UniProtKB/Swiss-Prot annotation:
This is Bifunctional uridylyltransferase/uridylyl-removing enzyme. SUPFAM superfamilies: ACT-like, Nucleotidyltransferase, Nucleotidyltransferase substrate binding subunit/domain, Poly A polymerase C-terminal region-like. InterPro entries: ACT-like_dom_sf, ACT_dom, HD/PDEase_dom, HD_domain, NT_sf, PII_UdlTrfase/GS_AdlTrfase, Polymerase_NTP_transf_dom, UTase/UR. Belongs to the GlnD family. The keyword Nucleotidyltransferase applies.
Length: 929
């Protein structure tokens, strides 16, 4: 075990009195002599009580010293002693060995994570019972006695019984068994038997197979990352198996142990794998991750490995994090977590470089293929520079001092790799990280360094290169504002990645937009081709910086604009372009907000938006930035509906900005929409097509994407042919994780409230709604609800129940308030706190009062809101329903019962108060009978 174990072993021993407990077990054996079952039960009860007490003591110490590795060592030591006590009891009181024949020998060995000498509170125990030959009755009885007692104590135990020969044979053919034996640790029994296994394993399995083992372990690591999500910046990480988590550290040590034959981690420095600083980083990362994992297990009471939102805040408090202006305690904790994950990745790269030097790890597949196809020298100078070489198709330094003699090389290396399509040699990245101190004010102001950086940002594969710059620390040191958001998470369910990862991904999506050919980016790609050439760099830097001021007390859009005004002149931007970048950052949320939460058929909405964007060129740039930003939030956030909303907002606003001129005017867009719809239904009679097109208002044809229009038309036609007064169609969106209910019914003032109430009574949470009324007074509403079941069949049955309830309410068979009161169950406490906000505005529309509510989402919220609005004697003309993770943002265009705006301050105040109470969940609001 490591030196830390030795250092704290006395402290552990003082808290677990093995001699006292052994004496108590002996007393139980004497008391229950001749009654084996009674003895086993009493012994299990005694040891379970001692284990509970020891765990409680370990948790108390952990909360005090916050040293996770020591806690894991304490827990492991306690478990070791319990197994030794059990072995002693089994061999002295239950199954005494007959006259030793040589066969009645056994070594009890810890394997897996337990073999490392570290245990989380709820971890499994892995044991190997080693026998000299085949299984004997005595060996089977002893192993069973130990195992049954452990199971009676409520422990999860993995076990195997093998001879030395069997262990060696299986280790040769099974990499999992090989890894388990690699980590064995002797507990009790026959030490020479264990020593024989270790010696033979080293000679017969390990020797000459280093490359095979390394390749297998790195492949396992890649597959594990692929299954869990490739990014180490996913905001609910798995502390055991996630990227940059404990399993990566374990893999690193397995490889080092196998290749360098080390037993303890401190030997990694002696063998030259790490220098002293890197070893300290290794220990610091391990201790932090063990602290998190042990606290997770203790707090949850189970083997919980995922840092889910509902656990993050509690773990942050247990680890002593506090809130700072602009950053919550939980956000500071998670930033630390992701910084550690990044360092784990760096350590893995360092080990891989060392292994390649010693040929234990094969060169990357691409490099081997290139070598076969192009038999050039393995190392050559990089074109355009004498300071770097190409080593196996990867860029490396030509001399140890290339960064010291010219610090611009810290930027140049990334540009050269990008320009010549080279991978990065781990040694070069190690040298870069060690040279970060050279990135000072002088280098930041260096024109050549800034020119190279802008070339990196605006050239192919910018996302890949920027990510490497970020992982090495160069990006955060060169642009210090970016350094402040490295590994920063936002404590919400909307953003899937840390802020820095989100920004880098957005740049990648911007490049996808520029390349074109992707249908979901069609509008943005078209606009990208039409912006002024000098504004190409503007949109790239704005995309990289739009969230750079997150985590500050000030609004991040305003603070980010200030960052841009300071930074852009240094990067070579003119005053006018600097101001344009600042404007884009300050307004980067505006277009998304207007498109998703305003009535785009209302002239005032368009005029207000036009006043913000000021020019067609600025609107083009803002549309492109908005598209990349939404797409970069995470999977399922961007969809065809949002793309169509942005398209509609853009083309509705263009004539206002140009005095009536539009590259694609409204009439032409309507004609094109009709034409593509007709093409999709060429088999329909012409008069039926004309009649269907006439049933929808222009806003429908301009705002709804074609695939949805096609589904609507088929659904409406089949419903009417079947004579249904009310029809419901069910669809599933796997990417967004929602079930879509499309309702076709006679329009009704309470229809939205009825739909929302039916969903609430079924426990279905509405995440967005698309609401349309036809010219002949029919409602065509699509409601998206969060999935509850994995199987589509189960989701379909739930949707059918909702539809039947809507029909029963409309026909007067059910009173919705009673159904909702009977069936709606308040959702469990959520980890998020969002202050409810209600805004009432008469400037966003000339005809309607616009009510915007925002707060913590929950099942039944839309029903409560629409019911409250109806009780306030307001008519809902249109509703715009959306959720952003855990935040609901619903906008209602309303009038009073006479069709007028709400102007009286006292009336507005009453509306605001009532809806604030609803958002806060103060009381259930019931509709009028």
């Amino acid at each position: 075990m490591d030196s830390v174990t030795t250092e704290h072993k006395q402290e552990v021993d003082d808290r677990f009195d093995t001699a006292r407990i052994t004496a108590a077990v002996d007393a139980l054996a004497e008391k229950h002599q001749g009654r084996e079952d009674a003895f086993r039960t009493a012994m299990a009860q005694l040891l379970k009580a001692e284990l509970i007490a020891a765990r409680a003591a370990a948790q108390a110490i952990l909360l005090k010293d916050r040293h996770g590795r020591r806690c894991a060592e304490r827990l492991c030591h306690v478990q070791d002693e319990i197994i030794r006590i059990l072995y002693s009891a089994a061999t002295r009181h239950l199954y005494r060995s007959p006259i030793p024949s040589g066969a009645e020998r056994m070594a009890v060995v810890a394997t897996g994570g337990y073999g490392r000498g570290l245990m989380a509170p709820e971890s499994d125990i892995d044991l190997l019972f080693i026998l000299p030959y085949k299984q004997t009755a005595w060996g089977e009885q002893v192993a069973e006695a130990i195992l049954y007692c452990l199971w009676d104590m409520g422990l999860k135990v993995g076990h195997a019984t093998r001879s030395v020969d069997e262990s060696i044979r299986q280790a040769r053919g099974d990499m999992t068994i090989r890894t388990a034996i690699l980590e064995t640790r002797f507990l009790t029994g026959d030490q020479p038997l264990y020593d024989e296994l270790v010696e033979r394993f080293d000679k017969e399995v390990v020797q000459g197979t280093a490359s095979e083992f390394v390749t297998a372990k790195l492949a396992e690591r890649e597959e594990r990352h692929r299954r869990g999500g490739q990014s180490r910046y996913l905001v609910e990480p798995n502390v055991k198996d996630g990227k940059g988590a404990l399993r990566d550290l374990h893999t690193l040590f397995w490889i080092a142990k196998y290749v360098y034959r080390v037993r303890d981690t401190d030997e990694l420095v002696e063998r030259g794998v790490f220098d002293a600083q890197e070893y300290r980083t290794f220990r610091r990362c391990a201790d932090f991750l063990w602290s998190v994992r042990c606290n997770l297990h203790f707090y949850s009471g189970r083997a919980e490995e995922r840092l889910s939102f509902d656990l993050q805040r509690e773990i942050a408090v247990r680890l002593g994090y506090t809130s700072h202006p602009g950053m919550q305690d939980v956000e500071r904790f998670m930033k630390h977590y992701f910084l550690v994950a990044k360092e784990v990745g760096n350590l893995t790269a360092i080990l891989c470089a060392k292994l390649e030097d010693q040929q234990a790890k094969p060169a990357p597949v691409l490099s081997r293929m290139m070598a076969r196809l192009r038999p050039t020298p393995a190392k050559r100078r990089v074109p355009d520079s004498d300071d770097f070489i190409v080593d196996n198709n990867r860029i490396n330094v030509a001399a140890p001092d290339v960064f010291k003699h010219d610090p611009v090389n810290l930027i140049r290396i990334f540009r050269l790799a990008q320009k010549h399509n080279l991978a990065f040699h781990p040694d070069a990245m190690r040298d870069v990280t060690r040279s970060l101190g050279l990135i000072n004010a002088q280098l930041r102001e260096n024109p050549e360094a800034n020119r190279l950086f802008m070339e990196i940002l605006t050239s192919d594969n910018a996302e890949i290169v920027l990510r490497r710059m970020n992982e090495t620390g160069v990006l955060g040191h060169f642009i210090r504002a970016f350094g402040k958001i490295v590994s920063m998470m936002q404590f919400n369910m909307y953003h899937h990645y840390t802020v820095d990862e989100h920004l880098i991904r957005c740049v990648g999506f911007l490049q996808d937009i520029e390349r074109g050919g992707i249908e979901e980016f069609a509008v943005a790609s078209d606009l990208m081709r039409k912006i002024r050439p000098e504004h190409r760099s503007v949109i790239y830097i704005a995309t990289l910086l739009h969230d750079v001021a997150k985590g500050r007390p000030e609004d991040h859009s305003i603070a980010g604009a200030k960052v841009a005004r300071r930074l852009c002149p240094r990067l070579g931007f003119s005053p006018a372009d600097t101001e344009l970048v600042a404007w884009l950052i300050e307004e980067h949320l505006t277009m998304s907000t207007v498109a998703q939460s305003r009535d785009l058929s209302d002239r005032k909405t368009i005029e207000n938006f036009a006043a913000v964007v000021q020019s067609v060129e600025q609107m083009k740039l803002l549309t492109i930035l908005t598209t990349a930003d939404i797409r970069g939030v995470g999977p399922g956030v961007w969809n065809g509906w949002k793309a169509q909303l942005l398209r509609s907002l853009y083309y509705e606003t263009e004539p206002v900005l140009t005095g009536g001129f539009s590259e694609v005017d409204r009439g032409k867009r309507l004609t094109a929409a009709y034409a593509e719809f007709r093409n999709a239904f060429a088999e329909w009679p012409a008069d039926e097509l004309d009649a269907y097109i006439a049933r929808h208002y222009p806003a429908y044809w301009l705002k709804v994407e074609l695939p949805r229009k096609i589904r609507h038309a088929r659904f409406v036609r089949s419903s009417e042919q079947a004579g249904h007064k009310l029809a419901i169609n069910v669809g599933f969106d796997e990417v967004r994780g929602v079930t879509e209910l499309t309702i076709f019914a006679a329009d009704h003032p309470w229809l939205l409230s009825i739909i929302a109430g039916a969903c609430a009574s079924a426990g279905a949470n509405i995440v967005d709604a698309q609401i349309y009324t036809t010219t002949d007074g029919r409602a065509l509403d699509t409601i998206s609800i969060s999935r509850e079941y994995d199987r589509d069949e189960d989701e379909g049955r739930r949707a059918t129940r909702i539809g039947e309830m809507i029909e029963d309410v409309l026909e007067g068979k059910l009173r919705l308030p009673e159904v909702v009161a009977r069936r709606t169950v308040r959702s469990k406490a959520r980890p998020f706190v969002i202050e409810p906000e209600v805004t009432i505005n008469n400037q966003w529309s000339d005809r309607y009062t616009v009510i915007e509510v925002s707060g913590l989402d929950r099942p039944g919220l839309l029903y409560e809101l629409t019911t409250a609005i109806s009780k306030l004697n307001l008519n809902i003309a249109s509703a715009h329903v959306a959720t952003f993770g855990e935040r609901a943002r619903d906008v209602f265009y309303v009038t009073d019962l006479l069709g007028a705006q709400i102007n009286a301050p006292t009336r507005q105040s009453a509306i605001k108060s009532a809806l604030t109470h609803v958002m806060a969940g103060d009381k259930a609001v019931q509709p009028a009978a």
